[in-house]
C-alpha cells in the first residue's frame, strides 16, 4: 500500500530519503521551492488546505519548475490515477 506524506515541507534530501523507501510526498504553497523543483515528475503530488486554491499551488509548481500550467495539471492527474490505480 503506498504512503503519501501530507503537507510535506522538508527539503530535497528528506524527500529523496522518503522516495527511496517508497514513500511519496504531497506539496502545497508552503513547500520548499527547491523540493518542488526537484521532485521527479512521476512523483509530483500537490495539495491545498484552508483558503488556498489548487490553482495557486499549480501555478507555484509551474513557475518553480519552469513548466506550463497544463503540464503540471496533466502530471497531477496522471500521478493521482496511478496512485489510485484508476
Identify the role of each PLM range.
Residues 7, 48-50, 67:
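Active-site donor-binding loop signature of nucleotide-sugar glycosyltransferases
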Residues 1-43:
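Catalytic pocket-lining loop regions of alpha/beta-barrel enzymes
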Residues 31-34, 52-53, 73-75:
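Short, surface-exposed, polar/charged, turn-prone segments marking secondary-structure boundaries
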Residues 58-86:
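Mid-to-C-terminal alpha-helical segments outside catalytic/metal-binding sites
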Residues 32-41, 55-61, 83-84:
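A short, terminal or domain-edge coil/loop segment
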Residues 18, 49, 72:
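Divalent metal-coordination and catalytic microenvironments
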Residues 42-53:
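Short acidic/histidine-rich active-site segments
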Residues 15-18, 53-59:
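Histidine/acidic-residue-rich catalytic or RNA/ligand-binding cores of hydrolases
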Amino acid at each position: 500500500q503506498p504512503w503519501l506524506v501530507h503537507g510535506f515541507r522538508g527539503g530535497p534530501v528528506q524527500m529523496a530519503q522518503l522516495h527511496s523507501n517508497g514513500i511519496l510526498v504531497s506539496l502545497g504553497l508552503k513547500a520548499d521551492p527547491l523540493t518542488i523543483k526537484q521532485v521527479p515528475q512521476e512523483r509530483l503530488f500537490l495539495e491545498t488546505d484552508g483558503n488556498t486554491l489548487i490553482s495557486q499551488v499549480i501555478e507555484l509548481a509551474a513557475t518553480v519548475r519552469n513548466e506550463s500550467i497544463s503540464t503540471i495539471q496533466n502530471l497531477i492527474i496522471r500521478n493521482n490515477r496511478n496512485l489510485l490505480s484508476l
